[in-house]
C-alpha cells in the first residue's frame, strides 16, 4: 500500500504508526482535527448516519492519493458511519480495508450494533470485489499474543504489532526470495488476516480467528548467515508448512535478512463472511 487513510480515533492512531516508515503517505480523518493537506476535520454529528451525511466532496483532499490505498477504521465508533461515503470517493483506487474489531462485551449497546452492521457490510463489499480485500484485526487476539500489556501505552503496543507486521509483509513481498512457491490468492479469497509464527515451535497466532481459511502464505525472514550455514532449515520450513496445510492451500517464501532474530509472518485468506 502506498497510501494509508485512517478514519476515527482508532484508524488515525494506526495510520500515524505507518508514518514512521517512508514508504507510506498518511492521511487522517476525524472529529476535531484541523484541516491540513493530510488531515481532515469531520463535523461532530450524532451516530453513524449523522457522520455519513456530514461528508461532502473529498476530491481536493484526495487529489494526490494514488496507487494502493489502505483504509483503516474501527467499526464501533460513530465516525465509522462516514466510511461508505468516503470509500465511494476512493473507488477508482485499489482499496484494502483494515478493520479493527473490538470485544463486543466491552461496548455499549449502540457501539455494539454499529460494529455488527459495519462488520458484515464491509465483508460483503469485499466479497463483491468493491475492495481488493478486507483485513480483519481482533484487539482481544492481539492482547493474547502480546501477553501482559501495561494499561499506559496499551493501544500503542497493539497498534505497533499490527503495523510492524503488515509493513514487514509488504517489504518481503517486494524483496527477492531465496526460495518460494507463492502464487496470487484465489479471486474470491478477499477476507484476510495477518499473524505471527514461532519459528522454533511452529505455533501460529492470527490477528483474527478466521473460519474456513482457504489459503495461507508464510513469509520466512531468516538471518542470511544461518541460511548459508545451517543445513536443516529447509526441512524445518517444509515441515512447518506441511503441518499447516490441512484442507488449506499453503505456500511459502524464504527471505534473507541481516536481523539477529528470525521472523515468520502468516497471511490467511477466506472467501466466507466471518461471524462473531
Residue spans of the language-model regions?
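Tubulin/FtsZ superfamily GTPase core signature
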Residues: 1-276
Amino acid at each position: 500500500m502506498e497510501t494509508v487513510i485512517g478514519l476515527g480515533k482508532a484508524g488515525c492512531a494506526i495510520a500515524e504508526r505507518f508514518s514512521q516508515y517512508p514508504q507510506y503517505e498518511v492521511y487522517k480523518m476525524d472529529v476535531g482535527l484541523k484541516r491540513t493537506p493530510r488531515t481532515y476535520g469531520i463535523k461532530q454529528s450524532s451516530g453513524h448516519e449523522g457522520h455519513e451525511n456530514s461528508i461532502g466532496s473529498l476530491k481536493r483532499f484526495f487529489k494526490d492519493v494514488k496507487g494502493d490505498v489502505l483504509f483503516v477504521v474501527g467499526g464501533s465508533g460513530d465516525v465509522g458511519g462516514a466510511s461508505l461515503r468516503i470509500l465511494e470517493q476512493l473507488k477508482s483506487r485499489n482499496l484494502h480495508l483494515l478493520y479493527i474489531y473490538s470485544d463486543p462485551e466491552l461496548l455499549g449497546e449502540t457501539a455494539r450494533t454499529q460494529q455488527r452492521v459495519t462488520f458484515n457490510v464491509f465483508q460483503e463489499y469485499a466479497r463483491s470485489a468493491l475492495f481488493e480485500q478486507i483485513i480483519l484485526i481482533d484487539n482481544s487476539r492481539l492482547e493474547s499474543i502480546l501477553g501482559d500489556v501495561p494499561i499506559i501505552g496499551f493501544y500503542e503496543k497493539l497498534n505497533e504489532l499490527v503495523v510492524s507486521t503488515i509493513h514487514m509483509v509488504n517489504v518481503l513481498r517486494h524483496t527477492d526470495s531465496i526460495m518460494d512457491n507463492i502464487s496470487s490468492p484465489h479471486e474470491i479469497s478477499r477476507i484476510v488476516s495477518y499473524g505471527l509464527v514461532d519459528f522454533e515451535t511452529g505455533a501460529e497466532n492470527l490477528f483474527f480467528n478466521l473460519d474456513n481459511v482457504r489459503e495461507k502464505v508464510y513469509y520466512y525472514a531468516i538471518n542470511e548467515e544461518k541460511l548459508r550455514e545451517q543445513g536443516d532449515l529447509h526441512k524445518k520450513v517444509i515441515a512447518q508448512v506441511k503441518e499447516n496445510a490441512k484442507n488449506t492451500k499453503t505456500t511459502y517464501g524464504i527471505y534473507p535478512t541481516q536481523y539477529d532474530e528470525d521472523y515468520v509472518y502468516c497471511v490467511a485468506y477466506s472467501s466466507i463472511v466471518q461471524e462473531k
